[in-house]
């Protein structure tokens, strides 16, 4: 079953995974709650935030669904999602020691993938969907606050520096481990660190080159395939099982090369 990446619609809010519907780590500033660190209805707050951003700015997310699912995208099970917004619409953004987000950038806040056989490579495809949509809208860059492996040190309150304490203030069940994207993942999909930090670096992906990282890989694979075809003897057969599926059906060599490249990234 193939996967379809499509813009998030407010009508599809109920299809988002439970954590995505209830997490308001980015959308609610704890300072506005006073002594109460819980919301009576976090799902309502999240849906209201999405509605506001969509109304004032436009699409702020992408969702992955099975392309072969019956019914429309709003009824299909959600396999994964990615959310982003202008930094001015993200109350949590100003709390990071590596803030502010650059004036020309949109802030990537959340990405999640449900356990499924087709989940491999899905986070990268979600990022690609977001990048493609933002390029069409003329956005120059996508930035994100990442978390490093060192955040485990912060479990001991004695290790929490003053500039990090505001980041750790959470609402409800939200935590930095669950609600901040891993910095290693971000660098793996092309982001570069523009504001280093031991715990929460800020990273940036330039969009003015389009899907450069993806296009370069595709172009290299095409050149490799063309070279292999030029040097192959006429009528030569491939080794058994080299470009065939387990069922014995032939597989397009170009597709096989692309799949290998994605799996190795």
Role assignments for model-derived ranges:
Residues 107, 126-130, 190:
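Short, hydrophobic/aromatic alpha-helical segments in well-folded domains
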